[in-house]
Every structure is written in C-alpha cells, then in structure tokens.
Curated annotation (Swiss-Prot):
It comes from the Eukaryota. ATP binds at L137, D138, T139, G140, S141, G142, K143, T144. The gene is dcl1. Residues 1428-1496 form the DRBM domain. Residues 37-65 are annotated as: Disordered. This is Dicer-like protein 1. Transmembrane segments: none annotated. CDD domains: DEXHc_dicer, RIBOc, SF2_C_dicer. GO terms for molecular function: ATP binding; DNA binding; helicase activity; metal ion binding; ribonuclease III activity; RNA binding. The lineage of its organism: Eukaryota, Fungi, Dikarya, Ascomycota, Pezizomycotina.
Length: 1525
C-alpha cells in the first residue's frame, strides 16, 4: 500500500545536489527579455511581435527561482560545513539543562590537566609496552592514565610506521557502558594530540555502511566505543584485527562467557596470525567479579585476554594516590521479618491478583523489613503516581496481548480500571510521619543517625550510599528529603534501563546532570546503585556507605575506591548476628590476599600453565559453523547471524510497519527442535526452515546462520553482511525520478501535419469540404459568416473548441466535414485560389504568388444558414456570388459620388501597413479630413489631421497624394482591428488596453472586396487552422503508434502548455496560451492504468515471483526512464505540442511570398523544442489515459492495454487486448486443489458478508493468510501476491470514479482525494466494517493485540459518529495487515472471476463509494500533511505566492549517513529548516517548523517581516512549494 501521506512519486522532488549549478538557459532568457524590451517598434513592420513579448512576461517567476535556488545553495553549503558535535565549542554560559550530553561532558573538562604519571604507573606502562598486560589497581589509582601513556607510545610508533608507508592501524579503547564511552573519550581527547572518535549503539552504528566506517577510521586514530560495536565491525570485516594496533579493555574483569569482550577475543583476535595481533591492555580493580577459586578465575582471565596480570610493586607510591579509607562497620539490630502494613493489606485484598503489581507487592513486602513501614507504604505512592499509570496500563495490554482468549480485551479494560482505583486509594491514604516511632527499620535508623552526625552542621562532606536495588535508592532519597537533616542535600544516581515501570526511567543525560550537581556540591549525598561503582568519574568523597553489602570483591574494591579523600570513611552496614554478613567480610579479606598475591609475582612469572590452553577458550564454540567471505574477511558465526538478520529486517522498514523484524518459530520434531525463520513482508526471501538441533537456542541460531547464507547467495547481503536495501530499495522505489525532470534537450518537432503535403503538385480537380460555423455565447459586434475549408483529402470530424472574439466573447467553433466531394473546373479552382490569396493579402498583409498546385487548402465563403448536415452538397453551400465578386474585383474603388453611407460596414485596410485594418461603423459628420483626430485615438506618426492620420506613404509620395486627394470626402467612424492573432485564449491586459475607436478617410486606404462579415470570420482563421493543425498532428502521432484515440483526447495527451506542466499547483512558467487542456489529467489516469496493467501482466506471466519481485519488475516497467526510452525509439517527441499559437507558423507552407514579412526563417527555428525527459515519459502515460477513455473493439480497456504494451516495450507485458491477460494466466496448483472444510466455511461466511461466491475458495484462503503464518501450517501461499494485484485494482477503480465525477479538478486535487480512498487508514477501517479482520490467519501476538485494539477503537468511533462516514479519519492508524487483506481480497475476487473488472467496480460501488459520495469532507485529509498545510496557509491565509520548499543532499557529517537539508524560503528569507535521512522527511520537518513560525505572527506582521506585497499586487498564481517527496 502506498502511504496515506505520500504524494505521487512521479512529482518532481526538486532535490538539489551540492555539485549542481544554476541553469544558464534561464539566465539567458532573462537577458533576452531585457534586450527585447529595449527595442523600439519603428512602425514599418507589417506585424508586431507582441506575442513574443507576452511569452516573456512570466520571466519574473524564473528570476525568483534563480534567486531562491542560489539562496538555498548557499544555505546548503553553510550547513554542510558544520563539524561534528565534539568539535563545536561548548557554550559554557548555558545552563546544564539546555546542553546536550556531549556538551555536558565537555563542560566538565574531564581529563584536562597535565599528564603527570607516578612511578608505579610508569612501571606498569613499561611492562605493557612489551607484553599484553592486565593492570590490577585500586579504583582511583589512575589506570586510565597508564592507558593514555600506552596510547601515546602506540600512536607515536603508528605515525612513524605510516611515514614509512606501512598500512594504517587504529587504536581501540573498549568500554562496557555508554556513560563510560562519553567519559573516557573526554579524557583521551584532553590528553592525546590525535583525533578521538567515540561511538555507541544508540547512534545507529549497526546501520552504518563500510564507507561510513572507513571515513571514521580515516579521520580518527583512536576510537572509544562499546565492545559490541567493535565486535560487529570485525565480524562484518569493516576492519580487520590486523588493522588495530592496540586493544584497551576497560573493566577487563567482564571478559567471560558471551560478553562482547570475550567474543572479540574468540571470534577475531585468536583467529589472526600471531604476528599481526594488536597489543592488549586490560584495566580492572580486581581480576575477578565472581565467587569461586580466585587463582583459577584469575588464570582463566589471563588466558581469555592472552595477557599477564600485573600490579605495582611499590605500594607506598600507590597509597599516595589511591588513599585507603578508614573502614568502619555500622551495626544495626536484627531486622523484623517482612510483614504487611495496613495499606499493604488493603491493597493486597483488592488487587493482590494483578500481575502488573506483582513486583511492587514484592518490593513493598521486603521493604517493610529492610526499610520500615513508611518506606514500604511510600513505595506505593511512587509506583501508582499519575505519570506511572500509563506505563502500568501498557503492561496490562502487553500481558493481555500474549493471551489467546477472546475475553482478553474486556479483562484488560477491567484491569486498567482496577489500577486507577488502586491509585486513588493510595492518593487518599494518610501517610504517617517518618519521625513517628516504629516507622523506620533499625537499619534505616542507624543510617539516619550516622548521616545526621555528618550533616547536622555546616560541612564539606560528600557521601555516596550504595544500595543493591534501584527502588531502594529512590525511596531512601525521598525519605532523607523528607527528614530534612539541616545540611544534607540528597540526590539519586541509578543505572539506565529500558522498560522500567514505577517511574524509574532515567537517561544517560540525567546521570550526568546528577554527577555534575554532586561535583559542584548542589547534591552532597548520592543514593546510588552499582552504576556509581564502576569506572564513572565521580569526584572524591569522604564518606562511602554500603547500605547493602557488596556481593563480590570487585564491588567492594570499586565502591571503596570512591572514598578517596584523606581520612575518608568506608562504612559497611552489617546486621548483628548475621553470619552471612560476617562471612562476606572474611571473603573480601581473602580476595585482598589475591591482590597481594598478584603484587608478589616475579617479573618473569607467567600464569599460563598447561590447564588453560587455547583449546579450552574455544571449546564452547566447538561444532558451531562459521563462514568467511574471502574478499573482505567478514565472518559469519552463530552468534552474529541473528544480529545480521535483525539489521537486514530493519533495512526494509521504509514505512511504519510494525513487523519489520524477524520471526523465529521453533517446533519439536522427532525428539529434536527445528526453527523456521520468517523474514519481514518486504524481503524477497521469505525465510527457511533450519536443520534439527537438540537445543532450541542452537536450532534458532543454526536457522539464522542458514538464512544469512541464503540471503548472501541471493546477493541480498553484501560482502560485509549488510543488507543491500539501504542503497538499492530506495533507488528502485524512486525509479520514477531516475531521469532528469528539469534538464531539457532539443528534439525535432512537427509543426505541420503530413496531410497538407499529400497529393500536391497539380491543381486539384476535386476537393473535400469542411463547413465552419461560429456559435457565440452572446451578441458580437459583427455577425461572423460561416466559412468553407476545402482540402485535397477529407478531414476528420474535429471536436468543438472555443475561441474568443471581440471583448472575450466565447465563441464555439463547429466543424462539419461534408460527405460529398466538390468537383471543380479550372475556373472554379482559380476563383477559390484568388479568394484564399485575397484573404491572406487583405486581412493578414501577406501577398502570395498564385500557385494552386502548391496549395494545401482553400478558404471560401458559405451561404448564411443556421446549420448544415454532412450530407449536404458543398456546391449548394458555397457562396459563389461572393466568390466570383472577389475574383473579379481587386478591391472596391473610391468614388466621390458615392453615398457616404455606402462606405459603412466594410472591411478597410492599409496596403502599406499590416497593423491598420478597420471595420467602418458610421459617418462622422462633425469631422472633416482636415480636422485633427480626437485625442483618444491610437497614436500614429502623423497626428495633424485625419487625412494624414490614415496615410502610410513615404515623404515624397505623401506630398504628392495630399496635393491630389479629395479634402471634402466624408470622415468615417471605424473600429481598429487589434493585432491579436491568438483568439484561442482571452486577451492579455496589453491587448485589452489598445484603443480601437478611430476616424478614417477612405481614399488613403483600400476597401476589401471581401464582405465584412466574412472578413470578420477570416480574422479567426489563424486560430482555427492552428487548432486543426494540432488535431491533425496528434492524430498522426497516434496513427504512428497504431492507436485509435479520440481526437480531443489525442491532442490533450500531446499538449504541454508550460515549462513546468507537471508541477500542478505551481505557478506555470512560460505558459503557452490557448492550447486547451494539457496532458496532466490524462497522465494521472494513464499512470494508474499503467500500474494496474503491468501488475496484472506480472501476476499472470510470472506465477513463481513473490511480491518483492513484482514491485521491482513493475517499477522497471513503469519507471519514467523506460517510458522515455520507448518514446524516443518511437519518436513520440515529434508530436508533442509544447508551443501555443505562433503567428509565424500558421501560414500555409510552400507558397512564394511576394509582399509582407517573411516568417520562414522563424518557422525553421520553431521546428525544434526543448523537452525534459520526464515530460516525454509523462506524455506516454497521458497517451495511455487517452487510449483508456477511447475504448476498444471488445472491451473498454483494449486500446489502453495495447498502448501499455507499445509504450513499456517489454516482454513482461505482451497483451494486446484485455482478454489476453486471461490466456496468459496458468492456474496454480493450490488454486485448483479441492477446498477443505475450513476453506468452504470461510467462503460461505464471506459470501454472506460481501455477496460474492468464490469458485476457488483456496484463493480466498490465500487472501486471508498473513506472511507471519508459518509455511509448515499453511496450505496456501500468503496474501502478498494477491495484495500486490489488488492494490493496483483499487487504485484504478477509485481514480476512474474521481476522474469522471470531477472533470475540472487538477491532478493534485485528484491525488490528494484518492489518497483518502486508497489509504491504509480507510481500508483498515473498511476491513473491520466488513468483518474481514476476524478471518485473518497470522502467527504474531503483537498483531493480535493491534487488531483487537484497533477494531474496538474504530467500532467505537463509528458508533459515536452519528452516521458521519468519515469517522475513520479520527482514529489511530490500523495494523498494516488489515488494509493488505482488503487489497488481497480484491485481487482474489478479480482472479476468481476470470479477470472481470466489473466485479471490482461492483465492490467499489457497494462498499467503498458510500464513504466518498461527498468528497468535500476529505478536503482536509491530505491537507493534514505538513507540506500541503503549509502551502495552503501561505497562499490562502497570508496571500503569499513568492515562497518555496527546497531540499538538497548534504555530505556526510561526523560519519553519519548522508543527510538531506530542507528549507522553507519566503521572499528570499529562510524561515525554517529541517534535516533527515530522506528528502520527504526533511521537508516534513521544515514544514512543521515553518508552520510553528506562522502560528506566532499575524498576516500584517508577516507582510511587514518578509516584505510581502503579493496580495497587493493581485497575483493570484501560486509558486511551487515543492512536493512532500
């Protein structure tokens, strides 16, 4: 399904790339315009060039675009120069709350200061230079500085090696948490000269390509990252172990089991030849963090890290740095057994059965003993606070989703109500004061007393209280806030964990802010969990309290290391008489002996032994297969396979599909387990079933491993095991934009139809007549006489078309081809020829040589009659009297004896000036020839009197004429004929401003023998013959393709009337006036049919392909590039009408011009036109649309099917008519199979609901089978193939309906409203309305939940809608499977009915159209899209037309994937920007920000701020804001 908010993919994206330049052609147009405007009309030419000037009147729009493009390019360059976040100087003046995490770290100046290593650090440093070493030092003793020393040494050696031409190598500093990545990177940056990068998973590193990583490796010599990132880089062969010079493991004691530290060693380090392995340096406060044999565990760690444990031999030096605190034991009396408080009892009685509260009950129960009554009760207040309730409700829903009972939704709803009830009970509960006796446990009482001793007075004490549980830390912090010890300022520092309930969510940023406050003294008592023990740079404090005793040596050493001040105290809280607590103290003493043992090791003593060899390290993975790509070295393992598949799945998530993840179905079989891997719907490989294994986990990993191999075999994973789709899929989806939509090339253009050139060479003996009548919409100044157009071949019946006479009176031109021929004598041919040439001379100031053998057509007067039938004899219609009179009289001679009134209602012309043509109106008795003309008349060179005003002779001829002319002749009122030739369009303002009233004398002029009414009609002939030419050329184009298309549709399909016709709502540039409808609506219709036709063809001709293959193959067929190539091959560009009326080319060709301006040279230049490749492709789609509306011999789609085959020019679409599709379809086995009982039952139920009986119920079963349903259980294929087909069928039936109902709406409107009809949102609602959702077969708990919740919501919305049909627009989006199954059902019905489209139309009429009878209610549906909404607000609310939305690609910044910058520019001011990984989402962000800006200002402020005068200028046209894509 296309996204509901996605604009048509064919619309130009207007994406700027950094290396593009402004089009020089546009600049040249501006220059030409300026030059022409400076030229003066000398008055001597026979015709003016007003039309050309008019063509350039829109150049201001082009200039605006140039300015906007330049503005955006400058902005793009500026943004592309932005450096990475750690290179930007930190704004120290901003409060911490406004700073990013990276800036918070930088602001604290971690690691700043001189590097001053102590002797013990130098000792370990020297050891680490020559051998792999694990440094065991107390927390706070400066292990990181040893690492810095080692890095400096390693980097110095690396720089020397690089200078000698050796391969580049990189240092890696590995950490175990995101927080440490920030901290250690800050330390290294402040102590190393070389660039340091730091990365962690939340940055999206798993989706980075090798090229991105190569940029980072090139840029940085040291990389700090979490261990899993390096592990994946090594497995994907983004980097090889031999390219690393040192591996530093922070908190190296984590190297065990399947920790990424251990996997890096096992899977990559030990696989490398010994000589190419990097140096290893591990750091830890204790080499072990578990209970057990200390020496054995230490030895195992050495083996895993291929290193030697070492520590300082001079403890006095260490003591100076890492001061040991005074260790104290704070004893407390034996705790009570856990008990139920009154609040606990009350809640347990009412809500004790609720699973979502189980953890809180458990904590409150234990807290009653460990913390006391008050703390136990306060846990409920925190757990059921208002901000936590939504999370608990979500937990209830999640639990309900995992059930299969049909009453789950109701029970879940009740559970949520019970949670709310519990919250209200807690809110109304009267909590006792913690000061009350018995409210606090003995343990908390001791802590309170001791802290009161430290903080009861002004003090510099800083304290950390360590707890085992996060909730304990939170409750204790709340308690001590309440107790109000005078100088105690409590705070909390707990770890980051996703999915927490009870308000315990905390971010890395909040951790840093707590540390910053602790450092500055704003907090002086931190209640912390283990997150404060390990590695974090917590400033020295003088009191550390173990509220909960440590569990391991490492916890003890690390927490003790936090007490670094001189005379600091480390207090352990121990229960009196608790043997376990006492035993733990003894264990720590034994572990301390281990550290002493480490320190006494001789320098050459190795703890390698023979009982821990490499075989034991690798033994765990024995039997697990691996696969290595030789070219890159990338390695596939059982562990990495699942991660690779997860990455592959996420690369397919281009829309909001919930299921862009891998599904693993593990089933028992013959005492073993087999796993089926099901990949997301968009994957071309659906998955596979793995080999049997004895464990579920091994079966899952084995199947994932085999799936990776299958994807690799099908070239869906690259040489680094990355999905190819982060590059390929967008390119395929954007195939419609894979050609240039802006750049144009010159192509040949036919300016005259070939029909005019046929049968020439001799005078005609017979001609075919076409009767031309004028039907004005209102009274005209002159009654137009009908005309006859005679041609050598019979003309087709042309559609009626309008022209605009007088003051834009719309007049319909009706052409009627006569059936009978006109047989002619030589004299009659001569009469026709003379009349036609006389029209050219008298009316248009062109005198041609009389050559009837070269003439293409003849014009003749017709007898005036209301109408003529085609069967009439042309000889009876022709006005022979007028024809003979014109032949015998060159003009009507002037006579002084004539009655003055006899000169009225004649056509008069100046023989020497083509601009002067008049219709006489009446005698003006108030003027004489010597009178000055009235001041309002049009200006001419001589204005001294009427006689001179009419005279165009040269100086000498003028004097001679004036000396002999008759100064007593009458002066006539006359109407000056405008120089307007393009009557196909209304007048321009310039043409309208021409003054047509004038006064003339007859003697200086010539009176035409052509009757005035006929001359008036002949003035329209250039427009009429131009339109006839266009019809004939379009017909010729269709005939060249062997299409039978209606003439009006053919011309519409070939008509491009502006430079940017395809930008429907944009202000059109260089508009060609009077061309009629352009191709855009037909292109919209044809595009839809093309999609449907190719979908059907692929479905029928490729039964074994899956949906992905169909999508890719269809895109290759319908993409603009393919259409363009086919069009060029068939020379379709010749027939495209890209120019409107031309006063240069409407004249007949081949005649010899004797007098008048020769336009032949200009006509030659107009035989070429500039077309964009996309325009040519769009015309192909328009031709398909025209063929569709023209029908066919057997089926109304026949001609359109033939057009598709011709224009896609591919073996994948071979049908010549509609019924060919059926003949190509081979019924698959599953469809022919006899239906079982369940399938028959489903068929009957659907027939009851939708009134269609399936001949093949198995088709219906396939339509309702979700891709998640395991193939082992399914008897039919999933619905994807049918959904692909049905999607195009629904598109077609909806578009046809809108196209027919709204003939005057532009494609943008049609697209926006089609979006509502075919949107996932509507089709999902329709699925529930029709009750289809209950029949879907799937295997997914989240899917069940989503369907249930959505069905309840949409049914509730319908019930509350009071009959409103648009109730579905206000609900959340449905699960994608629901619209998919509707589309699949439509596809199944289509196939089952033998491709009967009428069945689809019936489904549309019965179930879809009732929702869309009134399309006005969906006007805002598309407008909710930010880009459309912004367009509407700027144009309608603010009246602005000078704005645009530009988007352009930016180079990669700080190694991130290449981004796209979008900007909204209003009157050359950038008002909003947005960046994203695609143009679509960048435009959305920019539009949203721009809307926020507009929300803050009024219309008056807008005009003042942006100097917008669009409303005042009255320019109602609209500029291109760009599209949503």
């Amino acid at each position: 399904m296309p996204s509901a908010h996605a604009f048509d993919m064919r619309i130009t994206s207007d994406i700027y790339k950094p290396d593009q330049h402004l089009p020089m052609e546009t600049m040249k147009v501006c220059a030409v315009t300026m030059t022409e405007d400076l030229q003066e009309d000398d008055g001597s030419s026979d015709e003016s060039d007003n039309d050309e000037r008019e063509d350039h009147s829109k150049t201001g729009v082009s200039q605006q675009r140039i300015t906007q493009n330049a503005k955006f390019k400058a902005l793009l360059a500026q943004r592309a120069d932005t450096g990475p976040i750690h290179d930007v100087s930190v704004t120290h003046d901003l409060p911490d709350a406004q700073l990013s995490t990276a800036h918070l770290v930088a602001k604290q100046d971690l690691g700043i200061g001189t590097l001053d290593p102590r002797e013990y650090q130098l000792e370990l440093f020297e050891r680490a230079k020559v051998q792999n070493t694990i440094a065991v030092l107390d927390t706070g003793s400066g292990k990181t500085l040893i690492a810095v020393l080692l890095l400096k040494h390693t980097l110095e050696k690396e720089l020397n090696d690089r200078m000698e031409g050796k391969p580049h190598r990189i240092a890696f500093f590995l950490v175990d948490s995101v927080t440490l990545a920030y901290q250690q990177a800050a330390v290294l940056r402040n102590n190393l000269d070389q660039s340091v990068g730091h990365f962690f998973g939340a940055m999206g590193t798993d989706l980075w390509s090798k090229s991105v990583w190569d940029q980072h490796f090139q840029k940085n010599m040291v990389i700090v990252c979490t261990a899993e990132i390096l592990n994946q880089c090594l497995l994907n062969s983004y980097i090889k172990m031999s390219q690393i010079n040192i591996l530093i493991f922070d908190e190296a004691h984590h190297t065990k089991k399947d920790h990424p530290y251990a996997r890096i060693i096992r899977d990559s380090y030990l696989e490398e030849v010994y000589s190419k392995r990097p140096r290893i340096f591990g750091m830890t406060a204790s080499p072990i963090d578990t209970k057990g044999d200390i020496v054995d565990e230490a030895t195992r760690l050495e083996k895993l890290l291929d290193s030697r444990i070492a520590t300082t031999s001079n403890m006095s030096l260490l003591r100076q740095v890492a001061r040991r605190p005074v260790e104290r034991v704070w004893s407390f009396n034996k705790l009570e057994q856990p008990f139920a408080t009154s609040l606990y009892k009350h809640l347990e009685d009412r809500f004790g059965d609720m699973a979502c509260l189980e953890g809180i009950f458990r904590f409150a129960w234990q807290a009653s003993s460990e913390l006391g009554r008050w703390c136990s009760d306060r846990a409920w207040a925190r757990a059921l606070a208002d901000d936590v309730l939504p999370k608990l409700e979500g937990s209830v829903r999640k639990t309900a989703n995992s059930e299969t009972s049909s009453n789950v939704p109701e029970s879940a709803y009740k559970e949520i109500l019970r949670i709310t009830e519990a919250s209200e009970i807690v809110k109304s509960y009267a909590f006792s004061s913690p000061e009350t006796f018995g409210q606090l446990s003995p343990k908390v009482q001791v802590l309170r007393e001791e802290l009161a001793r430290y903080f009861g007075r002004q003090t510099e004490t800083k304290c950390i209280v360590f707890t085992q549980k996060r909730y304990t830390a939170l409750i204790l912090a709340e308690l001590f806030q309440t107790l109000n010890i005078p100088f105690l300022r409590p705070g909390v520092l707990i770890g980051v964990r996703s999915g927490d309930l009870a308000g315990m969510n905390i971010t890395f940023r909040q951790q840093f802010i707590s540390l910053v406050k602790f450092r500055t003294g704003e907090i002086n008592c931190l209640f912390a969990t283990s997150v404060a023990e390990e590695g974090l740079d917590i400033p020295d404090c003088n009191l550390v309290v173990r509220f909960d005793l440590y569990q391991t040596l490492i916890q003890y050493v690390q927490s003790r290391g936090r007490a670094r001040h001189f005379n600091s105290t480390y207090a352990s809280m121990v229960e009196r008489g608790n043997l376990e607590h006492e035993q733990r103290l003894l264990e720590v003493q034994d572990a301390e002996m281990m550290q002493s043992f480490c320190r006494t090791l001789p320098e050459d003593r190795l703890l390698y032994g023979f009982d821990h060899d490499l075989d034991t390290v690798l033994q765990k993975d024995e039997g697990n297969r691996t696969f290595r790509i030789k070219s890159t070295g990338a390695k596939l393992t059982y562990h990495s396979a699942t991660a690779i598949l997860a990455r592959y799945a996420s690369s397919l998530q281009y829309e909001k599909e919930f299921s862009a993840q891998v599904t693993y179905v593990v089933l028992p079989i013959n005492g073993a387990f087999v796993c089926e891997v099901i990949l997301p719907e968009k994957s071309p490989i659906r998955g596979l079933t793995g080999s049997p294994a004895m464990k579920k986990s091994i079966a899952k990993r084995s199947a994932a491993f085999d799936t990776c191999l299958l994807l690799r075999k099908n070239k869906l994973l690259d040489d680094h095991f990355n999905s190819i789709y982060h590059r390929r899929l967008p390119a395929m989806r954007n195939a419609k934009l894979a050609i240039t939509s802006k750049r144009t090339s010159q192509y040949d253009m036919i300016s005259k139809p070939s029909l005019w050139g046929r049968k020439q060479g001799m005078p005609p003996k017979e001609l075919h007549g076409t009767f031309i009548t004028f039907l004005p919409s209102m009274q005209l100044s002159h009654e137009p006489a009908p005309l006859l157009l005679f041609t050598r071949e019979r003309l087709p019946h042309f559609p009626e078309f309008p022209i605009f006479l007088d003051d834009d009176v719309e007049t319909t031109i009706i052409t009627t081809p006569l059936e009978k021929q006109l047989l002619l004598s030589e004299k009659e041919v001569d009469a026709l020829t003379v009349f036609t040439l006389r029209v050219f001379r008298d009316v248009f100031h062109k005198t041609y040589d009389k050559e009837p053998e070269k003439m293409a057509y003849w014009l003749a007067p017709a007898k005036v009659q209301s109408s003529y039938l085609p069967s009439y004899d042309p000889r009876q219609i022709l006005d022979w009297e007028s024809l003979t009179y014109v032949r015998d009289n060159d003009s009507i001679p002037f006579s002084t004896n004539a009655d003055p009134e006899s000169w009225v209602d004649l056509f008069v012309f100046d023989a020497w000036d083509g601009r002067c043509r008049f219709f006489t109106v009446g005698v003006e008795h108030s003027l004489t020839p010597s009178s000055p003309p009235p001041p309002f008349v049009a200006r001419r060179r001589h204005m001294n009197d009427v006689m001179n005003y009419c005279l165009s002779l040269s100086k000498n001829s003028r004097a001679k004429f004036l000396s002999t002319c008759h100064w007593d002749q009458p002066v006539l009122r006359a109407e000056l004929v405008r120089l307007r030739r393009n009557l196909l369009d209304k007048m321009t303002d310039t043409e309208r401003d021409v003054e047509t009233r004038c006064f003339i004398c007859i003697e200086p002029l010539k009176v035409s023998a052509i009757p005035a009414s006929t001359a008036f009609s002949c003035l329209a002939f250039p427009a009429i013959i131009s339109r006839i030419d266009a019809y004939l050329i379009s017909l010729q184009g269709c005939e060249s393709l062997n299409f039978t298309v209606k003439l009006d549709l053919a011309l519409e399909a070939f008509t491009k009337d502006s430079d940017n016709t395809d930008e429907h709502r944009a202000q059109q540039i260089h508009v060609q006036r009077g061309m009629g409808r352009n191709y855009e609506r037909l292109e919209f219709l044809g595009d839809c049919f093309l999609k449907m036709a190719t979908s059907i063809a692929l479905f029928t001709q490729n039964p074994d392909d899956d949906e992905f293959d169909y999508h890719v193959n269809r895109m290759c067929l319908i993409c603009n590039k393919n259409l363009f190539n086919a069009a060029v091959d068939k020379e379709i560009y010749k027939y495209i009408r890209s120019r409107g009326f031309s006063r240069h080319t409407w004249y007949p060709e081949g005649l010899k011009l004797l007098q008048g301006k020769d336009h032949s040279r200009k006509a030659t230049t107009e035989s070429k036109h500039a077309l964009a490749e996309k325009t040519i492709a769009d015309v192909c789609e328009a031709l398909i649309g025209a063929a569709l509306l023209s029908g066919g011999p057997d089926h109304r789609f026949d001609m359109a099917v033939k057009a598709v085959t011709t224009l896609v020019n591919s073996p994948s679409h071979k049908a010549e008519r509609w019924k060919d599709y059926i003949s190509f379809y081979t019924i698959p086995k599953y469809q022919r199979r006899a239906a079982d009982g369940a399938e028959l039952y489903l068929s009957r139920k659907i027939e009851e609901k939708l009134s269609y009986r399936f001949r093949y119920p198995t088709l219906l079963g396939s339509a309702f089978t979700h891709p998640s349903y395991p193939s082992a259980w399914a008897k039919v294929p999933c619905y994807q193939r049918l959904e692909f087909l049905g999607d195009s069928l629904i598109d077609m039936v909806c578009v046809e309906d809108l196209f027919a109902r709204f003939p005057d709406r532009d494609p943008q409107w049609l697209t926006e409203h089609k979006m509502a009809m075919v949107s996932n949102k509507f089709l999902g609602a329709l699925a529930v309305k029709l009750g289809l959702h209950t029949h879907l077969k799937y295997f997914s708990a989240p899917l069940q939940s989503q369907i249930t919740q959505y069905a309840e919501e949409i049914q509730t919305a319908e019930g509350e809608s009071e009959g409103a049909v648009d109730y579905w627009t206000v609900t959340k989006d449905p699960p994608k499977c629901l619209p998919d199954m509707v589309e699949a059902y439509v596809g199944a019905v289509f196939v089952d009915s033998d491709f009967n489209f009428e069945v689809i139309e019936r489904f549309f009429r019965d179930y879809i159209k009732p929702f869309f009878e009134d399309m006005a209610i969906y006007d805002t549906f598309a407008n909710k899209h930010p880009t459309t909404f912004l367009h509407n607000r700027l144009t309608n609310e603010f009246g602005c037309v000078n704005y645009c939305l530009k988007a352009g690609e930016m180079p990669s910044i700080d190694g991130a994937p290449a981004g796209v910058l979008a900007a909204v520019i209003v009157h050359d001011v950038v008002i909003a920007e947005g960046t994203a990984t695609s143009g679509r989402y960048a435009k959305v962000k920019a539009s949203e920000k721009a809307l926020a800006v507009l929300d803050e200002i009024s219309s008056a402020e807008f005009q003042r701020k942006f100097r917008c005068d669009c409303r005042e200028s009255g320019d109602s046209a609209r500029l291109d804001i760009g599209t949503a894509i």
